[in-house]
From Swiss-Prot:
Lumenal compartment spans: 1-22
Protein known as: Maintenance of mitochondrial morphology protein 1
Region described as Disordered: 50-98, 274-330, 398-426, 449-494
Quaternary structure (record): Homodimer. Component of the ER-mitochondria encounter structure (ERMES) or MDM complex, composed of mmm1, mdm10, mdm12 and mdm34. A mmm1 homodimer associates with one molecule of mdm12 on each side in a pairwise head-to-tail manner, and the SMP-LTD domains of mmm1 and mdm12 generate a continuous hydrophobic tunnel for phospholipid trafficking.
Signal peptide: none
Gene: mmm1
Residues that span the membrane, as ranges: 23-43
Organism: Aspergillus clavatus (strain ATCC 1007 / CBS 513.65 / DSM 816 / NCTC 3887 / NRRL 1 / QM 1276 / 107)
Alphabetized InterPro entries for the sequence: Mmm1 (IPR027537), MMM1_dom (IPR019411), SMP_LBD (IPR031468)
GO molecular function, one term: lipid binding
GO cellular component: endoplasmic reticulum membrane; ERMES complex
One BP annotation, GO: protein insertion into mitochondrial outer membrane
Membrane topology, from the record: Single-pass type I membrane protein
Family: Belongs to the MMM1 family.
Length: 494
């Protein structure tokens, strides 16, 4: 008898087969899922982290691929196929990489509007970027100035490196000092106590025919208020007619910088840039090449220096100037809308003295203003060579301290300098009352105008400091004030 399709004997066999297939498929799927999880999540490589700051920038600020970013296979095959000569080892720098707009785009500075030049004038392109406060720059500048002041005070007794000797030699230059002025003696120098404050820094682009795409220039406001930045001198006016030294008029001056404010302009001058044009009546500003060979300063109008071309300074022997490799320079200047407030005090005469003559103050202020404008006020600039920043063992130093000693266990070079150490102990050992240097006193007592505690003598109408009061009490002042050939005693101040 044949079995029917609905026979119960065949149902357990079919159900067991379907159960086995389902079980095997389930186990296989679990194994595949575990294998995929282990491969891609445990042993897989983590994606590279995004560059900091790039995720928050717009698509227009993305860095463009460099022309040198070729694949390693192409670079390797090209280096094997091509054998460049020695002169072609260094790849040329494309003009697009040094363009002003390219630099601003790659440094994520805001774009500048296009303003064409009119009537051949240089057009300034102002940027919409927010100005910077320069707080960090003020700290660095303050530390540098403080170190210069401390170094100048520590070298005050040096016969060659003293700031007093340097100023005395500069003021008594025979090529610049007139014949009717006797030797100038520096009686008081104060390097100040405050520091300049820089703020509101912004980058602008200036049209320059010597560079592709113009020239970038940094503008920053500077302000300095310091009553202790002063210098006091003494000299004598000589009357050489009808005979030499027929009359002598003692003069004492003190100049203090009350306040200075202006806009500082800083720009880079590449080595390939031709020398800057200067007016015919003043020499061109020295570059890094001429600063080492010739020590002449620009704009010495009073000294009678003739204009020289940039880089054509000859040595004293009359030979050709030393040829050095061109270097990049930094040019800085101030805009004409600066403010320089000076305080000039004067004493004229030996016995009967004229104090704070207004005409003398006007002449001194005008001369200082002219000296400043001839050197660092637009269109004149000061050009300073950039230092060599390549790391060298001769300039390598090791900081003192436990952290530095434990971090580096290697042998130290014999030329390594110990930064700090003895200099720091000497600074703590001596605590100067003020950064003030006094020169040798001449036949007359010094004119101490930097000190704000001087008293006014009503009887004689002159200024007398504490040191002068002590000399008067000793009875030696009358002998010291007697100068042969001075004006007679009958002359009284008008």
């Amino acid at each position: 008898m044949s079995s029917q399709p609905g026979d119960p004997a065949t149902l357990p066999a079919q159900s067991s087969l379907s159960f086995t297939q389902g079980f095997l498929l389930g186990q296989l799927s679990v194994v595949l899922v575990l294998a995929a999880f282990i491969k891609f999540f445990i042993f897989g490589e983590a994606p590279p982290p995004p560059s900091r700051g790039l995720s928050h920038r717009s698509a227009t600020h993305r860095r463009s691929n460099s022309i040198y970013s070729n694949s390693p296979q192409e670079a390797g095959s090209r280096s094997l196929r091509e054998k460049p000569s020695t002169s072609n080892v260094l790849r040329p720098v494309p003009s697009s990489s040094t363009n002003t707009r390219s630099i601003l785009r790659k440094t994520y500075y805001s774009a500048i509007p296009t303003n064409p030049a009119k009537h051949g004038r240089l057009r300034i392109h102002h940027s919409s970027h927010q100005p910077e406060s320069l707080d960090w720059f003020n700290v660095l500048i303050a530390q540098t100035i403080a170190q210069y002041r401390q170094t100048a005070y520590s070298l005050k007794d040096s016969p060659t490196s003293s700031i007093l000797n340097s100023l005395t030699a500069a003021l008594n230059n025979p090529e610049k000092k007139p014949a009717f002025i006797d030797k100038i003696t520096v009686t008081d120098i104060s390097l100040g106590e405050e520091f300049p404050i820089f703020s509101n820094c912004r980058i602008i682009a200036v049209d320059d025919p010597n560079s592709d795409g113009g020239r970038l220039q940094a503008l920053m406001d500077v302000d300095l208020s310091d009553d202790n930045l002063s210098i006091a001198i003494e000299t004598q006016l000589l009357l050489n007619y009808p005979k030499p030294c027929s009359a002598i008029l003692p003069v004492a001056l003190s100049i203090s910088v009350v306040r200075f404010s202006g806009t500082l302009c800083i720009s880079l001058v590449p080595a390939s840039t031709p020398p800057l044009d200067t007016p015919s009546h003043s020499p061109s500003p020295p570059t890094a090449d001429t600063a080492t060979s010739g020590r002449s300063k620009p704009g010495d109008k009073a000294g009678g220096n003739q204009p020289r071309s940039n880089g054509s300074t000859e040595d004293p022997a009359g030979g050709n100037p030393p040829k050095t490799s061109p270097k990049s320079n930094v040019a800085f200047s101030f805009l004409p809308d600066y403010r320089l407030d000076l305080s000039v005090r004067s004493l004229i005469g030996s016995r009967s003295r004229l104090q704070d003559v207004p005409k003398v103050a006007q002449l001194v202020e005008a001369r200082v203003q002219a000296w400043f404008e001839e050197r660092v006020v637009e269109p004149r600039v000061q050009v300073v060579g950039l230092p060599d920043l390549w790391p060298r063992m001769g300039r390598t130093g090791v900081r003192t301290g436990d952290d530095a000693e434990t971090a580096s266990n290697g042998p130290r070079s014999t030329v390594s300098a110990d930064i700090g150490g003895s200099a720091r102990h000497e600074e703590l050992a001596r605590e100067p009352e003020a950064l003030r240097f006094r020169g040798l006193l001449g036949a007359r007592p010094p004119f101490d105008v930097a000190s704000r505690t001087s008293s006014f003598n009503v009887e004689t109408g002159d200024l007398r400091s504490r040191s002068m009061t002590r000399q008067e009490s000793s009875g030696d002042l009358s002998d010291q004030l007697h100068i042969p050939g001075s004006l007679p005693e009958a002359v009284t101040p008008g």
